[in-house]
Amino acid sequence: MTQAARRDCDVLIVGGGAVGSALACALARLPLDTVLVEAQEVRQLSQPSFDTRVTALANGSQQILASLGLWPQLKGYTEAIRTIHISERGRFGAARISAAEADVPALGYTVENQALGRVLWERLRDAPRFTALAPAKVTAIHRDERCVTATIEQAGETRDLRAKLVVAADGARSAVRTALGFDALEHDYEQRAVIFNCATEAPPAGRAFERFTQRGPIALLPLTSGRTGVIWTLPSAVAAEIAALPDDAFRAELQTAFGYRLGRFTRMGARHLHTLVRIASGAVHGPRAVLIGDAALRLHPVAGQGFNLALRDVATLAEVLVDAIEAVGGTDDVGASEPLDRYAAWRAADRERVSTFTHGLIRLFGESLPGMGLGRGIGLVAFDLLPGAKALLARQTMGKAGRLPRLARGLPLS
């Protein structure tokens, strides 16, 4: 990796969080000059993408990271998810998905975001054709049929950089998406997530929980050292008030909502509030530009699918670019329309499937019409007794549904 200025590159990635840096790691194996622009100082790993929150890596995402050679460095920071328990507070019926039933070592893994960021950026330090501009920001973007020209501000200086392709990986409020003229539709769930780590009397021991309540879902994830990560979704009107309660009062509220499947909640970590919205870009590509991760589609966190969907964006984009390179025998034009059209068409079904799944869960378990609670309970019991239904959901949860890119199948890019 170099910090030296470049005036031209093949690929410009805007956004150096987990998604942008994962793409840079994938492209580092290709004969491409890649520049990444990140607003924060990456050496400090202080950007919001790499805070103390936890990411749930699906089984398929673990395979992508393993195919990129990152898993040996990351594995020591992860905890396996071997079962997922799904239930609704105050209703009978529950469903369980297990790694044993799916015939995999784990349904997924949890990892703290800071550890993920550290591993990704350590890999990029050794990438010879990779340049990081950080802290820096893109202040303007112009496109023509030959290239993208980005105006970059860094350390009080401004310069232009030309690229054959620009990749927006700068999150749900993507400035690049706006600058490129992409429209986006936003749905406000009128909910906020209280996110924190805690300890419980009984360690989670590889068990994850999705508990639906009248106020919103509670997700518990197993962490290293016997800790538990919690994502508690609450109505916006009460979330800040509950999050600000003293520890004892907050613990009592959480205990009432979740129950005692892990015994009593004991130590509580710092709480962080996040507003929950669904933001979908009307298009994910255009001339010499492509959107990935939250810049393309921001999801509700109910099923923990956001980063996993983004990693499949990364794996698919890397694959279509390497195929384009090999088809012409060089890096003549990685921003041509054909590979970007192929990328967008490939990713459309996965995005639609995951978006419908997560949005549908919120609507289903948020409905309070008479008889709906009973119907959901019966549905959970029936689901738990139907191997075919469980296998289908397991594939979706593990990121194994639909057509998969080579990295997700354990194959090299080329």
Language-model segments: what does each one mean?
Residues 28-50:
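Glycine-rich FAD pyrophosphate-binding loop
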Residues 16, 170-171, 299:
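Glycine-rich, N-terminal phosphate-binding loop of Rossmann-like dinucleotide-binding domains
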Residues 49-89:
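N-terminal FAD cofactor-binding segment of flavoenzymes
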Residues 10-36:
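N-terminal Rossmann-like FAD-binding beta1-loop-alpha1 element of flavoenzymes
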Residues 240-335:
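FAD/FMN-dependent oxidoreductases across multiple families
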Residues 5-8, 77-179, 187-192, 247, ...:
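Conserved N-terminal helical subregion
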Residues 319-414:
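C-terminal helical "tail/cap" subdomain of flavin- and related membrane-associated enzymes
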Residues 65, 147, 151, 155-160, ...:
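Conserved FAD-binding catalytic core of PHBH/FMO-like flavoproteins
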